Amino acid sequence: MTAPAELSPTLQLACDLIRRPSVTPVDADCQAQMMNRLGAVGFELEPMRIEDVDNFWATHGSQDGPVLCFAGHTDVVPTGPVQQWQHEPFEALIDADGMLCGRGAADMKGSLASMVIASERFVQDYPNHRGKVAFLITSDEEGPAHHGTKAVVERLKARNERLDWCIVGEPSSTTLLGDVVKNGRRGSLGAKLTVRGKQGHVAYPHLARNPIHLAAPALAELAAEHWDEGNAFFPPTSFQISNLNSGTGATNVVPGELTALFNFRFSTESTVEGLQARVSAILDKHELDWSIDWALSGLPFLTEPGELLDAVASSIKGVTGRDTQPSTSGGTSDGRFIATMGTQVVELGPVNATIHQVDERILASDLDLLTEIYYQTLVRLLA
C-alpha cells in the first residue's frame, strides 16, 4: 500500500472521498470536501438540498463567454457482501499492483477528484480565463435520480443559466484510459403492459379467456419488430421484455390477467410518440383488452464532432498518445438531463471494467493522467 505522503493531490482527494460511505442517496460530506477546495480558489458555491438529496452548483469566472461544466455524482451503489471483498470497500488503498481499490474508485470518485484538482490548477494558472468553469454535483445518480441533476437542471433553466459544454465524469474507458468517450446516449422508454382475460378452470377453457395465450402472439410480434435502422452514431433501437407475470400459482386455474414489463433503448431515429403509436397498433391488431403505463427515463442525445469533442480528443491524444473512439453505447447517465439545456455533453472517466462489482478498482496512476486531460481540455476551451 502506498503511504499517504507519497500520493498526488488527486489521489489524496480520491482516497478521502472513497473513505466516505456515500451509498445513494447519502453524500457523507463528500460534497463538503469538494466545495471546501473549490471555494478556497474562488469558486462561488451554491448548495442545493432537494428532498433527501445533496447537490451543489459552483462557478468561477465571468458570465461573458462560454461555460464549461464538470458534472458527476458522489453517491455509490451498495457494496454487496463485504466478506467477498479482498479489502474493506471503503478503505481506499493502493495495492501492490498499483490499483486504487474501493467502492466508487471508478464510478465515480476518481473522476471527481481529477475534476477538482484540474480546476484548482486551471483557475490559479489562468485567473482571468474567459467564460466560466462550473460544477454540477449530485448524490442521486445511482438511485431514483428524481431530486439530483434533473432537479438542479430545472432550477438552472428557470433562471436562464447557460451551459455550453459539459464533461460528465462517468467511467467511459474500456481497456485503457481515454480509449472511449461517450458522445451521446440512447433514450430509455419503459412500459408496464396489462392484458386482461377471464379467469376460469383449465378443464373448461371455453368458459375462460387465457391472457397468456392471447398476449403471446402480440409479444412475439413486438419482439420481432424492426423499429429503425439506427444511424452513423447509434445502433438500431432495441426492444426487450424484462418481466412477465400471470397466474395464481395453481396449475388448474386459467389466469385472468397478464402483466409485461418492457423497455426500449432508442436512437435519434425514433421518437417516443412514434414508438408508443406502433406498440398500440400491434396490440390493437391482436384485439387484446389492454392498458399500458409508460415511463420515459430519458431522451437520446448526441454531441457531434465540434469544439468540445475536438478539445477532449486532442487532450487525450496529448496526454496518453492514443486516439479516442466516440461511442453512444451503454446505459443512461445524468448527461441526458444536461443535454436538454442545449449543451454539448461528453462522458470521460476511468476504465469501467469493475464498476458496481465486488473489488471495484482502477489503475491509480490513471487518475493523475485524467487530471491532466481535464486540465488540458480547460486550457483548450477557456484559457
From Swiss-Prot:
Q: What is its EC number?
A: 3.5.1.18
| Listed Pfam families | M20_dimer, Peptidase_M20
Q: Which residues form the signal peptide?
A: none
Which reaction equations make up its catalytic activity?
N-succinyl-(2S,6S)-2,6-diaminopimelate + H2O = (2S,6S)-2,6-diaminopimelate + succinate
Active site (record annotation): 75, 141
What does the record give as cofactor?
A: Zn(2+); Co(2+)
Key words, A-Z: Amino-acid biosynthesis, Cobalt, Diaminopimelate biosynthesis, Hydrolase, Lysine biosynthesis, Metal-binding, Zinc
Pathway(s) of this molecule: Amino-acid biosynthesis; L-lysine biosynthesis via DAP pathway; LL-2,6-diaminopimelate from (S)-tetrahydrodipicolinate (succinylase route): step 3/3
Family per similarity comment: Belongs to the peptidase M20A family. DapE subfamily.
What the entry lists under HAMAP family is as follows: DapE
Quaternary structure, per UniProt, is: Homodimer.
The name this protein carries in UniProt is: Succinyl-diaminopimelate desuccinylase
Q: What organism, scientifically named, is this protein from?
A: Pseudomonas putida (strain GB-1)
Classification of source organism? Bacteria, Pseudomonadati, Pseudomonadota, Gammaproteobacteria, Pseudomonadales
The primary gene name is dapE
